[in-house]
C-alpha cells in the first residue's frame, strides 16, 4: 500500500498547476483600451470585439470568455462588428487586432449602403 501511495503523491506533484489567463478587460468608445485583469480559472480565451457605428466611429470591448467564435463581419446586427480571440496572457492588447484594411472594405460598404 505504501509504494502505491508514494507513486500517487509523486505523480500528483508532477502535475502542472493550472494558471489563470490574463486579458485586457474594458469597453471604450475609440481606438483601443488597456486594462489588464486576471480571468477566472475556467476562461480559455481573451476576446476583442469592435463595433463600427460609422466608418470613423467604433466601440472596442475586451473581455475574458470560456469559448470564442471569431467573426470578420456580423451582418445580422444594425452595426458592423468584428470579433477576434487569442489564448495567451495579454494577447488582446494589440492596437488593432481586427482584419486588415482590405478586409474591412465590405463592412464599410455595408455601413454606407445602410445609411442610404
Curated annotation (Swiss-Prot):
CDD domains: TFP_LU_ECD_LYNX1. GO terms for cellular component: dendrite; endoplasmic reticulum; plasma membrane; side of membrane; synapse. It holds the Pfam family Toxin_TOLIP. Coiled coil: none annotated. GO terms for molecular function: acetylcholine receptor binding; acetylcholine receptor inhibitor activity; acetylcholine receptor regulator activity; ion channel inhibitor activity. One of its GO terms (biological process) is synaptic transmission, cholinergic. It is a lipid-anchor; GPI-anchor. Residues 93-116 form a propeptide. Residues 21-105 form the UPAR/Ly6 domain. Keywords: Cell membrane, Cell projection, Disulfide bond, Endoplasmic reticulum, Glycoprotein, GPI-anchor, Lipoprotein, Membrane, Signal. Disulfide bonds join 23-46, 26-33, 39-64, 68-85, 86-91. It is found in: Cell membrane; Cell projection, Dendrite; Endoplasmic reticulum. Its main location: membrane. A lipid is attached at residue 92 (GPI-anchor amidated asparagine). Residues 1-20 form the signal peptide. Interacts with nAChRs containing alpha-4:beta-2 (CHRNA4:CHRNB2) and alpha-7 (CHRNA7) subunits. Interacts with CHRNA4 probably in the endoplasmic reticulum prior to nAChR pentameric assembly. Interacts with KCNA2/Potassium voltage-gated channel subfamily A member 2. Acts in different tissues through interaction to nicotinic acetylcholine receptors (nAChRs). The proposed role as modulator of nAChR activity seems to be dependent on the nAChR subtype and stoichiometry, and to involve an effect on nAChR trafficking and its cell surface expression, and on single channel properties of the nAChR inserted in the plasma membrane. Modulates functional properties of nicotinic acetylcholine receptors (nAChRs) to prevent excessive excitation, and hence neurodegeneration. This is Ly-6/neurotoxin-like protein 1.
Amino acid at each position: 500500500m505504501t509504494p502505491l501511495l508514494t507513486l500517487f503523491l509523486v505523480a500528483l506533484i508532477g502535475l502542472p498547476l493550472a494558471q489563470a489567463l490574463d486579458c485586457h478587460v474594458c469597453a471604450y468608445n475609440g481606438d483601443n483600451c488597456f486594462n489588464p485583469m486576471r480571468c477566472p480559472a475556467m476562461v480559455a480565451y481573451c476576446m476583442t470585439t469592435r463595433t463600427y457605428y460609422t466608418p470613423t466611429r467604433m466601440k472596442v470591448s475586451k473581455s475574458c470568455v470560456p469559448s470564442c467564435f471569431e467573426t470578420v463581419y456580423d451582418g445580422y446586427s444594425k452595426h458592423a462588428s468584428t470579433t477576434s480571440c487569442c489564448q495567451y496572457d495579454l494577447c488582446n492588447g494589440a492596437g488593432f487586432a481586427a482584419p486588415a484594411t482590405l478586409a474591412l472594405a465590405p463592412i464599410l460598404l455595408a455601413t454606407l449602403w445602410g445609411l442610404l
